[in-house]
Amino acid sequence: GARRGYYQLGPVLLRTGDLFGLVTRDSEGGGSAHLTVFPRIVAIRHARFPSRRPAGEARARARVLEDPTLIIGIRPYQHGDGLRRVHWRATAHTGQLQSKLFEITAQMDAHLLLNLRRQDYAAAPGDAAETAELGVTAAASIAHHLLDKRQRTALLVLGRDPAAADQGGGLRVGAGRAREQLAAILSVLGRAELGEAEPLPATIRREKDQLPWGSLVVVITPRVDEAALSALLGLRASGYEVSVILVGRGARLPAEAQALGAMRISASRVVTEADIRGLGI
């Protein structure tokens, strides 16, 4: 099949001439168009993706999630309530400790973050282009699996978009699970290329302030250095589910990686497409 990518079609080159080929004339006809070839999708056969409901929405470790941005009332303070939960205005009004009552939400978005920052691939062993393709295939396969399970899924790619003039914001698809969502994600992944981008740690810290609380964040990258590790730990400590997928033959975690396990962050290695089939988050 055609190789994944973003291709220009046209303009058509027209060549005319006499019967003997002594005189020829070249001219261009028509305009040009572009074609995006989607990436491969590998079926995740024995997925260990967490599922909250039969419909397939991913879950946090708790059966339900409380959204601290949605306060729906107050209740008397209970032993174990943190200071952030205390409703100080209501406490002052009643003379007794009162705690905030949060909206219960049963939905948790999945956010895929694919790192195609050229510098990170140059620093990792192995062929950069081959490793990048593996990362794109992993992202496409995970998105397909999650959306097939009716999980709201979003995508952010750190890299170059040949179809866009401004590369500053990366290639992004907002969270959704409509029928068109997979096509939108595959279209972005089809265009994505290695390129200049914001460093992964800075992106994680910036995105943390915008993600819905309790979201599942899947980071696909060829390497995790100490700065990225610190950002991942900060993300987990803030209440997000975090999974790291390292791609490429030389994918290694730093010596401090045992901290991931201590914080219950899953880490997987993908060296070949066959490894994608058994991915779990």
Predicted regions, residues:
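An amphipathic, basic-hydrophobic helix/alpha-beta surface used to engage anionic
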Residues: 1-171, 216-220, 231-234, 238, ...
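Secondary-structure junction/capping motif
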Residues: 40-41, 127-131, 178, 199-203, ...
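Alpha-helical structural motif
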Residues: 70, 84, 106, 178-185, ...
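Short, structured secondary-structure boundary patches
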Residues: 81, 174-183, 263-269
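Short, conserved, surface-exposed binding loops centered on an aromatic residue
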Residues: 102-103, 145-147, 176-180, 207-211
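A general structural signal for well-ordered alpha-helical packing
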Residues: 136-143, 182, 186, 204
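Short, charged loop segments at secondary-structure junctions
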Residues: 164-199
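Von Willebrand factor type A / integrin I
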Residues: 187, 191-281
